[in-house]
Amino acid sequence: MTRRVIGCTVTTRHAIEHWSPRLSSNTAPPSNTAVSSNTAAPSNSAARLPAPRADLVVGPAALPVPGPGELLVRNRAVAVNPLDEVKQWTGDLMYRWLPYPSILGEDVAGEVAAVGPGVDRFAVGDRVVAYAVGMERGRRHDAEGGFQQYTVVREDLAAPIPPHLSAEQAVVLPLAVSTAATALFQRDHLALPHPSADPVATGRTVVIWGGATSVGSNAIQLAVASGHRVVATASPGNHARLRELGADVVVDYRGPSAVADVVAAVGGAEVAGILAVGTGSAEPCVAVAAATGARRVALASPSVSFGSLPRRAGLSLSFARTMTRLVGANLALQLAARRRGIRARYVWGATLMSNEVGPMLWRDHLPSALADGRHRCAPEPEVVGTGLGAVQCALYRLHAGVSARKLVVLL
């Protein structure tokens, strides 16, 4: 069947179903919501992935209840990420532990509808932006998924939205800023000093390849806030914007001398580390590390793109070729790095919820940095539509390719 969603034609291979809320202890509204005893409980709905490679289906959902250290957020905006697109497009290549139907989505912004036991940093009605981790192993997948009207989030992965920012602007942050912080500050990656409002200059440089991406835009700001000079790469049309975010020098990554240009921009300074963002960024970053003496490269993207894979079940020739290229590229990359004494490791943004980086970012840094404008919501949001039905349209747009923008759906 065919549905038109906010000017976007979405063809589904699965009939739209209406999902009945599960009758369990988690379906009742919590006692500390903004709903009084004389008011009907708010209803919830979600955009679910019903099966591998299927289109999202919108239907009723149980109203989640926040547990200790958690918030229930009434979402006003959600954003889509490559992880959502890859999960939908490739089936169980990633997130094999997720059951079907699944509620995807990591980026949410809205108002606090309820607080769980032990939460004193937020109150009902507060505007918040948060990183929803329902897709991660061991989490409550339905309750903590982002693509629904009400989402449970961890208090230590949420920050207040200051008055001068809208939910639409703030929602570009969660997964991107979390991934950037994981890459820059976790001990097993670049291990930089934590950001502050008055950073002390370290005299060192951080190289960020892919500065116009969502992760790169946040990494530039965090690296500057930790006292580092930043050399970034981007297409020429994005150079001015990256300088506004704090990059000292921006190089065209598509130029034939891009690696040499980055090395020249470093100018002999000590390189604290290199962050590679975007398909194809790993190899030039290892080359830059070898030329500058850097010893750590954080890899935020796979070596090959999954964009050309057909959206169908079974082993296809293109799938086999892609996986062969992926394995070969990773092996060659690691061998090249080790020969030069360089440690190149892949970044998984959600790991910050298990160490000090998560609370440092979401409790200590972002609230004040957003309030006084030291950290900007970047890249710019592009609203695809309104309502959960527009999430699928946003995923198709993302698959087609987006540059220096974050696709957002208003709820």
Where in the sequence are the language-model features?
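Terminal helix/beta-alpha structural elements that buttress the NAD(P)+-binding lobe
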Residues: 2-26, 42-67, 74-109, 114-115, ...
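Long, intrinsically disordered low-complexity tandem-repeat segments
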Residues: 26-40
